[in-house]
Amino acid sequence: MKKDYYEILGLTKSASKDEIKKAYRTLAKTYHPDVNKETNAEEKFKEITEAYEILNDDVKREQYNQFGHAAFDPNAGGFGGQNPFTNAEGFSGFSDFSGFGSIFTDFFGGFGNSQRANPNRAQRGEDRHAVIKISFIDSVLGKEIVEPLEKFETCNTCNGSGAKSQSDIITCTQCSGMGEQIKITKTFLGQMQQNVICSKCNGIGKEIVEKCLICKGKTHTKTTKNITIKIPAGIQNGQTLRVENYGNAGLNGGSNGNLILSIKVSPHKHFVRKNNDIILRLPVSIKSVIGSEKVEVPTPYGFEIIKIDPNIKTGDELIIKNKGIITKYESGKMIVIFEIFIPKLTSFEKKEISTILEKNADKFYEKWIKEFE
């Protein structure tokens, strides 16, 4: 015959929940198998835990006070754990018809014997996302950035259990460690039994009496570390980089998620990227054109010196190889588009130029205009 639960904890029926919890903690620390090496310590610890799980739950305590141990004995009749789909002749409802299994599992979430994913399995944490802004030049040349990043690590105090001590981890008092509860749903077919995740333990089957003082039951702590992020040369706007293990914390010993960084490249005032080429509109004075002068062409890698062809006009292009986007697969080019401009002149300078030009007939224009006659 089982011993009275109140007697096991050394309490009376009028004991408050605080008194029940205090009595359990005291006895659990005394008889925990990791601490007490006596032969009957483990059995005594299980007995104490069972008593606490019943008396700490208001519904179960009320049932125990009214019916005693018979309230939780499936063979005692009354309100035991009988399957509502089983009748006196042994008919087991829809479970005999395999064709209905998947249909009703999808529709109602599964019957009492349906399997569910193990909530205690290791689960990888979710990825976190952030945007990092870089300059156009940094996107071409690449760069290393040192950033302080938050990282979740297993709590060293509780070793990831979330509890103040091992004795604070008990079987869930609501689902008795099953991780599930039976829910009865009324449908057009009648009452249907459905297994749902326990709302108290979220399907884990365990609950914590007193949480870890450091992580507050979260099983992990948050630290900040300076991490070097390598921006590869040639990266494009919208591309992503991955920083492993800097995402959200995993569950049940699962690995952290990753930090996904989306690259946002700030536009340059003069350089424009087209695939792996860089386009530059270069203003050139008419003086430099006439005199076929040398001018500097800016590139992301420094300045290039070119000699102006005296025959160029606005819109003409010059290709400079290997001065575009350079990746391990391809070396882009710089495309220079000339824009000829006339500098500001004084009245005297304009008169001198007019005198010079009057001596030279504009044969190109004369030929062009005759095409319309």
From Swiss-Prot:
Pfam families: DnaJ (PF00226), DnaJ_C (PF01556), DnaJ_CXXCXGXG (PF00684). GO terms for biological process: chaperone cofactor-dependent protein refolding; DNA replication; protein refolding; response to heat. SUPFAM superfamilies: Chaperone J-domain (SSF46565), DnaJ/Hsp40 cysteine-rich domain (SSF57938), HSP40/DnaJ peptide-binding domain (SSF49493). Its main location: cytoplasm. InterPro entries: DnaJ, DnaJ_C, DnaJ_domain, DnaJ_domain_CS, HSP40/DnaJ_pept-bd, HSP_DnaJ_Cys-rich_dom, HSP_DnaJ_Cys-rich_dom_sf, J_dom_sf. Binds 2 Zn(2+) ions per monomer. Transmembrane segments: none annotated. Zn(2+) 2 binds at residues 172, 175, 198, 201. Zn(2+) 1 binds at residues 155, 158, 212, 215. PROSITE patterns: DNAJ_1, DNAJ_2, ZF_CR. Belongs to the DnaJ family. Homodimer. This is Chaperone protein DnaJ.
